[in-house]
């Protein structure tokens, strides 16, 4: 069965966002990443700025803080409301048209569909560090810290909401090392597997 939907999960600095965008362009299909923040904000009733800062990063302080987080009258935390809004938006987008969706636990949210190709992009530390230094104009020490912090927040969010382990190969159809394969080959492999 052809894969209508491609989800891209990625380590920070691996180029996963770039690879996803290029695959969407080459296939002539929709690409969703940060641009769905407005839709998530509308669905949740929270500001786009709040969603941008918190959608992939909650729960912020672990289970203890989560237990005491602010809740609405139904008992849902703000983090849960954001996740639920994100889930609804992703399901709507996947039902509407072929697309590439980057991040936001889309692989798990769409796990019951047969027409989804789930990809995890990772890379080697030196290449990821250099990419972050170049993209964000930071020194090596800051790049390493940004990488560790971002991946830790992504992992915490993913593990909490999916009850799976972020980056574990069995959760994905493909795991690709962008440092070893290069972006171009990653794109070609994804497109070939999506046929």
Kindly give the residue locations of the regions a language model identified.
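Pre-Walker A (Motif I) flank of P-loop NTPase domains
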Residues: 2-11, 97
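Glycine-rich phosphate-binding P-loop
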Residues: 8-21
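Short beta-strand-centered segment that lines the nucleotide-binding/catalytic pocket of NTP-utilizing
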Residues: 30-41
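ATP-dependent small-molecule kinase phosphotransfer cores
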Residues: 41-98
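Small-molecule kinase domains that catalyze NTP-dependent phosphoryl transfer to phosphate-bearing small molecules
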Residues: 59-66, 139-184
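Short, amphipathic alpha-helical "lid/cap" segments that border enzyme active or binding sites
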Residues: 87, 183-191
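RNA pseudouridine synthases
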Residues: 93, 109-112
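Conserved phosphate-donor/acceptor-positioning beta-strand/loop module used by diverse small-molecule
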Residues: 112-134, 140-148
